[in-house]
Regions:
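Bacterial Sec-dependent N-terminal signal peptides
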Residues: 1-26
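Extracellular and organelle-lumenal recognition/adhesion modules and their flexible linkers in secreted
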Residues: 19-195
Length: 195
């Protein structure tokens, strides 16, 4: 009896592994899924909708009431970019995005301390839109350890990305760093609450 149960459980486990392995094949080579709850998003390669070439990548929410986000991303060493300015650009197409969609990039230092970040939250892709090019520009400080980037979808909808490019740019190209744009005041103010 125990042997029969073991065989049944083993078959079920192998079947589950093979099913999930098939799902992993949808993720493009060199990329991985992440986010607050990536299982709420279908992600993969699309051979019917693309900006150029033969393929694009897409994220689609499975839950119409989702408040989560999913991302397809890569992480690379910052070593070749230390002290330089980089641009992530790419084309995005969207369908019925009720939350927000974007390309994003983050520069991390020691212990994953964020040194630069832009997820296009202040200029997010919403609704239904045809292919449009977007750009993110960040400085890579000398103490950077990794560069992380990708495409994300927050909430309900579907987003495609194609022709992403990461390249060096010169100082004449302004940074889009959301951390830099949210400067803290130099002095305390209204401590008596009278203003």
């Amino acid at each position: 009896m125990k042997t029969k149960l073991f065989v049944i459980l083993s078959i079920a486990l192998v079947t589950a592994i093979l099913m999930f392995a098939g799902e992993d094949n949808k993720i493009p080579k060199g990329w991985f899924a992440a986010g607050s709850n990536p299982s709420e998003y279908e992600m993969g390669i699309d051979s019917t909708t693309f900006q150029n070439g033969q393929f694009s990548v897409y994220l689609k929410s499975k839950n119409p009431k989702s408040n989560e986000f999913g991302t397809l991303m890569q992480s690379i060493s910052a070593e070749n970019y230390l002290g330089k300015r980089i641009m992530l650009s790419g084309y995005i197409k969207s369908e019925n995005i009720e939350g927000w969609g974007a390309i994003w990039m983050r520069i991390d230092g020691e212990d994953e301390n964020q040194l630069g970040f832009d997820n296009m939250y202040n200029r997010a892709v919403k609704g239904t839109n045809d292919w449009k090019k977007y750009e993110i520009v960040l400085d890579v400080p000398s103490n950077s350890k990794s560069i992380n980037y990708g495409i994300l979808l927050g909430g309900f909808g579907k987003i495609w990305a194609d022709n992403l490019n990461l390249k060096l740019v010169d100082e004449s190209v302004p940074v889009t760093n959301l951390m830099r744009n949210n400067k803290l005041p130099a002095e305390p103010n209204n401590l008596d609450f009278e203003e």
